Curated annotation (Swiss-Prot):
The gene is groES. This is Co-chaperonin GroES. PANTHER family: 10 KDA HEAT SHOCK PROTEIN, CO-CHAPERONIN GROES. GO terms for cellular component: cytoplasm. One of its GO terms (molecular function) is protein folding chaperone. GO terms for biological process: chaperone cofactor-dependent protein refolding.
């Protein structure tokens, strides 16, 4: 099963972050925060404006993005946990 987001929504796979603290302490799973960055897997066709025009999204498939800790809705697709969120939930695109 694949998922195709509608309108201004995007599908994001969380990117796992380091599981150690800066001091080298290994964190157990229960103490780890969910990562707030990920890779965009799919994008909708754009935001529908009040006049009916569709504005293309600024993000694209493959972009690495930052988002808020509670952004989006978690879904399972083919056993993989993904996030569906609006483009406006994205705080920024990681470059370089």
């Amino acid at each position: 099963m694949n998922i195709r987001p509608l309108h201004d929504r995007i599908v994001v796979r969380r990117v796992e972050e380091e599981q150690k603290t800066a001091g080298g302490i290994l964190l157990p799973g229960s103490a780890q925060e969910k990562p707030s960055q990920g890779e965009i897997l799919a994008v909708g066709n754009g935001q529908i404006r009040e006049n009916g025009e569709v504005r293309a999204l600024d993000v694209k498939v493959g972009d690495k993005v930052l988002f808020g800790q509670y952004a989006g809705q978690t879904v399972k697709v083919n056993g993989e946990e993904l996030l569906i969120m609006k483009e406006s939930d994205v705080l920024g695109v990681l470059e370089g």
